[in-house]
Amino acid sequence: MTEISMLKDVQKIIVLDYGSQYNQLIARRIREFGVFSELKSHKITAQEIREINPIGIVLSGGPNSVYADNAFGIDPEIFELGIPILGICYGMQLITDQLGGKVVPAGQAGNREYGQSTLNIRTASKLFADTPDEQLVLMSHGDAVTEIPDGFHLVGDSNDCPYAAIENSEKHIYGIQFHPEVRHSVYGNDILRNFAIFICGARGDWSMDNFIDMQIEKIRETVGDKKVLLGLSGGVDSSVVGVLLQKAIGDQLTCIFVDHGLLRKDEGDQVMGMLGGKFGLNIIRVDAKDRFLELLAGVDDPEKKRKIIGNEFVYVFDDEASKLKGVDFLAQGTLYTDIIESGTETAQTIKSHHNVGGLPEDMQFQLIEPLNTLFKDEVRELGIALGMPENIVWRQPFPGPGLAIRVMGAITEEKLETVRESDAILREEIAKAGLDRDVWQYFTVNTGVRSVGVMGDGRTYDYTIAIRAITSIDGMTADFAQLPWDVLKKISTRIVNEVDHVNRIVYDITSKPPATVEWE
């Protein structure tokens, strides 16, 4: 099976993973410049990099100290490949340590820096072309470079960091102590663009049309004349996968829509009408509501919920596949963010993802995950490129476990109904207010908390519903949406008046991080 990163005619910049939970944002930013980019293990060898043939290499940040016994290293031959290298934070310290410089705890060189700092450019550099000599950057480091290797020179510093940017112009090796991939580094995108376009010589011609052509070729090569099953949830990811697979293999694709009793209001009928009718996908609808809810009865641990749903979902596929002939592959709408949030060898698992960590070991299918190198906004872009209508492409994201992870604690029919009805009201009012494109994701959660209220002349003791609405670009970081008060008031009033067993509404004003988008 041909991986995109191995295709010789595709320019790519690889990012070596040293453990920062958000280092995949580096790859995302580089893709914005029309250059394919993805993470690779820091254990990659120089020979493996030669085979990939990238035009640039980025060494990411990470939590380790380069002088520690268990520090993540690098194949020293990588520095002799003649490929431009950019080290970010830990990556800069690793370059320094490996090439003969010195790295010490920051207290010995200045001070630790966490947050925005002013970077002062002291020497002209291609990396900082067309950016100001003083600029705000995000620092997050407990170690500092005190001596730079031979052949390197100082490019920039800050009040507490004597070497905030260094370079070896002859070998095209650059190091920066700050994080250009986050928005708090005001000119971070310009710096990464300078590296990709002007230093690495990228053409900037990577597009979704390229992705479609390559994925179709890859799918056909992998599948051959065999059959594929796809689980449809009605969400953006599985819908885009369905259209892409149909384009690649036509009637070799059978879609299974598992109605597990955890869907949004009227979602089952909408899925069948939208994808089965308009796009002509071959869809088998399975009513598995009782099967799922019986297994979930009394389960309040979110990880157990995810595992149960992931396992049972595949077992339902097994049951349906046994009725078909020659089915060898299971397709999923796994995204790049799903894989990262489920943990890599260098990063801690935040939560097992329904498309990654919930699969049983005895699964009978081989997996196909056509979107697993894409971020959410890229999936929407892909949908448009495939000719899908905007109302489908911009459909609200919905997790594989469905409402199970939007009901805190044990699941009951009563709790599910409160979320279904309140979520429908929220989506309706957001659309009426013309905010459905401005707010990246929005949904309601049954918090499992009951509180005292008064309705009419009587005392109530009913559920508290939380509204979660966020703004984001790629789903890796997010801010809570500052919805107009009149819109929030209308939503709240409608929910408590129209939804049974609810008497209180709260608004979640937590960003990501520290919170995740979903509550469970």
Curated annotation (Swiss-Prot):
Record note on quaternary structure: Homodimer.
HAMAP family on file: GMP_synthase
Listed name of the protein: GMP synthase [glutamine-hydrolyzing]
PROSITE patterns: GATASE_TYPE_1 (PS51273), GMPS_ATP_PPASE (PS51553)
Keyword tags: ATP-binding, Glutamine amidotransferase, GMP biosynthesis, Ligase, Nucleotide-binding, Purine biosynthesis
A Pfam family reported for this protein in Swiss-Prot or TrEMBL: NAD_synthase
Annotated GMPS ATP-PPase domain residues: 206-395
Role: Catalyzes the synthesis of GMP from XMP.
Catalytic activity: XMP + L-glutamine + ATP + H2O = GMP + L-glutamate + AMP + diphosphate + 2 H(+)
Residue stretches making up the Glutamine amidotransferase type-1 domain: 12-205
InterPro entries on file: Class_I_gatase-like, GATASE, GMP_synth_C, GMP_synth_GATase, GMP_synthase, GMPS_ATP_PPase_dom, NAD/GMP_synthase, Rossmann-like_a/b/a_fold
The species this protein was found in: Streptococcus uberis (strain ATCC BAA-854 / 0140J)
Residues involved in ATP binding: 233-239
Active-site annotation: 89 (nucleophile), 179, 181
Cellular component terms per the entry's GO annotation: cytosol
The organism's place on the tree of life at top rank: Bacteria
Pathway where this protein functions: Purine metabolism; GMP biosynthesis; GMP from XMP (L-Gln route): step 1/1
Signal sequence coordinates: none
One GO MF term: GMP synthase activity
Enzyme Commission number(s): 6.3.5.2
